[in-house]
Amino acid sequence: QGKGLNEYTSLEEAISDLLRANGEAPTPDRKGFVSGKYGIAESNYQKLMRGDYDETHVLPDSHSFAKHTPEKTACFKSLLEHYPVRGKRIDGNARKEWDIKQRGITVLDPDAISPTITGHPDDYLHYCEPRIMTVRECARIQSFPDWYEIKKKYTTGGKMRKIEVPRYTQIGNAIPPLFAELAGIVLKRMI
């Protein structure tokens, strides 16, 4: 709808400017953590999501990296290098074979569209870096523009899930803004 976007945006087209390899700086709202810096916006989708936010901000909001143990990072690195299937959940026997303790994880496919974003950050392994996705990457996939600030804790667990709505959950439970806009346009035409 006049935004210069393709019908489909691959995962890489959506978030390749948010790689950890672009550099790090201390996370402003999360003591002891680091956030990623912007890389060059290459796709029309990245340019649309950034707007002019990156002209006034070096760090994307909520782009703080999880702290993985060396063992988990090694497992993730091995999966990226050797696991043959991208975009499908690793569970069952493959989970045991790769010594994955969590209920399952999906190694993301850079050339495909993203699977549904969930409120659980451990569900997805970044397509080229040995880490889980950041809140900002999930928000970008959901079409939240970079100027949109996400507040509260990054994650929570146990009984606190019933009373807190952390950032990953906010994004995973949200209606993607571009979808909402398009739905509004369609409804307006129907009236």
Which sequence ranges carry the predicted segments?
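Flexible, glycine-/basic-rich loop-and-beta segments that form/coincide
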Residues: 1-32
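C-terminal target-recognition/interaction regions appended to catalytic cores
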Residues: 33-191
